């Protein structure tokens, strides 16, 4: 038997429309040294293709990826001195976007230009500036340095990336306000959760306790405590300071969670980790610790990816109090998709909210206890009865 629900107030999902532009702001393309190999690198981003190369001084340059002569792919070319040479006809393009030389021609069209993208290197990471209006970056929104990344007392970046298709960048931003998904997706108990949005920065403050009914994240996961401060600096680059405690063991680490759009319905998700080197630990053991921690972070990101791959876009989410400031976060995020002159005060004014986690944790702890008791009963049953 089926029920006709027409006309009884059924809430429909409003998927809305995808943005018609890409976010204004700094976007991280990865670890800078990975582009210092003496060859051009292609990057699919912002609905086009970019080429990244280092000049003779080691300065990284980013241009539109297709040659303005006959459309050759510059990322398939070579670096010659301070220019990238097209593989099609050897036209040479400088980091400023100007055509520097056409070797076979009597005259080089020196007024010919391609698009040159503003770049910055911060904490060993390469950034490119995107602005739909073509304005230069405001110094006030420059990505902050991470001093630990240059310290001998911390490990080097361990970096990962994955292409997410069928999902818009906003899906990952929504996680900033999502307290409940830490239990269901990441198997933790968030006992404290707070958001602060102000200017171009959106922050999340979290205390998370490991679930003792979860085995595959480590035998002592139930003893794990995490204090986390995570801030998006602009639309796509998050720095997450992590303070972990496992019983009597403490560790400090910094996680980068960032992305850049490929199309309006796909993006490259990147994450990188540096870990403070424990005093007295060998380089080999420190490297192993860093690798294990990064693998754990990667597992968490891939848990989110599975959701994004199968969910639908929703502009009118139906929320309860514990879901927090989803609409306020989206209002903050909208500032990067409008002209600077159209930024409204409410997009950048300070907004602060602490989510009451008491009711949620009462329910979740009861579920954890139930799972543990079920496990005890199962363990007491002789093997031949399983």
From Swiss-Prot:
GO BP, sorted A to Z: cholesterol catabolic process; protein homotrimerization; response to cholesterol; steroid biosynthetic process
Binding site for [2Fe-2S] cluster: 67, 69, 86, 89
Sequence ranges assigned to domain Rieske in this UniProt record: 26-128
Positions with a binding annotation for Fe cation: 175, 181, 186, 304
Cofactor: [2Fe-2S] cluster; Fe cation
EC number of the protein: 1.14.15.30
Catalytic activity annotation: androsta-1,4-diene-3,17-dione + 2 reduced [2Fe-2S]-[ferredoxin] + O2 + 2 H(+) = 9alpha-hydroxyandrosta-1,4-diene-3,17-dione + 2 oxidized [2Fe-2S]-[ferredoxin] + H2O; androst-4-ene-3,17-dione + NADH + O2 + H(+) = 9alpha-hydroxy-androst-4-ene-3,17-dione + NAD(+) + H2O; 3-oxochol-4-en-22-oate + NADH + O2 + H(+) = 9alpha-hydroxy-3-oxochol-4-en-22-oate + NAD(+) + H2O; 3-oxochola-1,4-dien-22-oate + NADH + O2 + H(+) = 9alpha-hydroxy-3-oxochola-1,4-dien-22-oate + NAD(+) + H2O
Induction info: Induced by KstR.
Alphabetically ordered keywords of this record: 2Fe-2S, Cholesterol metabolism, Iron, Iron-sulfur, Lipid degradation, Lipid metabolism, Metal-binding, Oxidoreductase, Steroid metabolism, Sterol metabolism, Virulence
CDD domains, per database record: Rieske_RO_Alpha_KSH
Keyword Oxidoreductase: yes
Broadest EC class assigned to this enzyme: oxidoreductase
Pathway: Lipid metabolism; steroid biosynthesis
Cofactor annotation comment: Binds 1 [2Fe-2S] cluster per subunit.
Molecular function via GO: 2 iron, 2 sulfur cluster binding; 3-ketosteroid 9-alpha-monooxygenase activity; iron ion binding; ketosteroid monooxygenase activity
SUPFAM superfamilies tied to this protein: Bet v1-like, ISP domain
Function recorded in the entry: Involved in the degradation of cholesterol. Catalyzes the introduction of a 9a-hydroxyl moiety into 1,4-androstadiene-3,17-dione (ADD) to yield the 9alpha-hydroxy-1,4-androstadiene-3,17-dione (9OHADD) intermediate which spontaneously form 3-hydroxy-9,10-seconandrost-1,3,5(10)-triene-9,17-dione (HSA) via the meta-cleavage of ring B with concomitant aromatization of ring A.
Subunit comment: Homotrimer. The two-component system 3-ketosteroid-9-alpha-monooxygenase is composed of an oxygenase component KshA and a reductase component KshB.
Protein name per its UniProtKB record: 3-ketosteroid-9-alpha-monooxygenase, oxygenase component
Species name: Mycobacterium tuberculosis (strain ATCC 25618 / H37Rv)
Taxon lineage: Bacteria, Bacillati, Actinomycetota, Actinomycetes, Mycobacteriales
Gene name of the encoded protein: kshA
């Amino acid at each position: 038997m089926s029920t006709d629900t027409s006309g009884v107030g059924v809430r429909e999902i409003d998927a809305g429309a995808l943005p018609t532009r890409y976010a204004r702001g700094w976007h991280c393309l990865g670890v800078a040294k990975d582009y210092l190999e003496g060859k051009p690198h292609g990057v699919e981003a912002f609905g086009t293709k970019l080429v990244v190369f280092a000049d003779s001084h080691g300065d990284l340059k980013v241009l539109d990826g297709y040659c303005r002569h006959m459309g050759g792919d510059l990322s398939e070319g070579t670096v010659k001195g301070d220019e990238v040479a097209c593989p099609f006809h050897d036209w040479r393009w400088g980091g400023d976007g100007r055509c520097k030389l056409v070797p076979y021609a009597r005259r080089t069209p020196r007024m010919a230009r391609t698009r040159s993208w503003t770049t910055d290197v911060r904490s060993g990471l390469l950034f490119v500036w995107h602005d739909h209006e073509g304005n230069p970056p405001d110094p006030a929104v420059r990505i902050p340095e991470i001093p630990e990344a240059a310290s001998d007392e911390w490990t080097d970046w361990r970096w990962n990336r994955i292409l997410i298709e069928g999902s818009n960048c906003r899906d990952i931003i929504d996680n900033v306000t999502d307290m409940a998904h830490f239990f269901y997706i990441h198997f933790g108990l968030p006992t404290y959760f707070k958001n602060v949005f102000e200017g171009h920065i959106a922050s999340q403050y979290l205390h998370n306790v490991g679930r003792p009914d979860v085995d595959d994240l480590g035998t002592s996961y139930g003893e794990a405590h995490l204090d986390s401060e995570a801030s998006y600096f602009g639309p796509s680059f998050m720095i997450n300071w992590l303070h972990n405690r496992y019983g009597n063991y403490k560790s400090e680490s910094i996680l980068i969670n960032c992305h850049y759009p490929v199309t309006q319905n796909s993006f490259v998700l990147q994450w990188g980790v540096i870990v403070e080197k424990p005093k007295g630990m060998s380089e080999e053991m420190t490297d192993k610790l860093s690798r294990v921690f990064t693998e754990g972070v990667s597992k968490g990101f891939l848990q989110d990816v599975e959701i994004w791959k199968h969910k639908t876009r929703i502009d009118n989410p139906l929320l309860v109090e514990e879901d927090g400031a989803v609409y306020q976060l989206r209002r903050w995020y909208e500032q990067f998709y409008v002209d600077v002159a159209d930024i409204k005060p409410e997009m950048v004014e300070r907004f602060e909210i602490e989510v009451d986690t008491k009711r949620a944790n009462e329910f979740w702890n009861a579920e954890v206890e139930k799972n543990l008791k079920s496990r005890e009963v199962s363990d007491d049953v002789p093997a031949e009865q399983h």
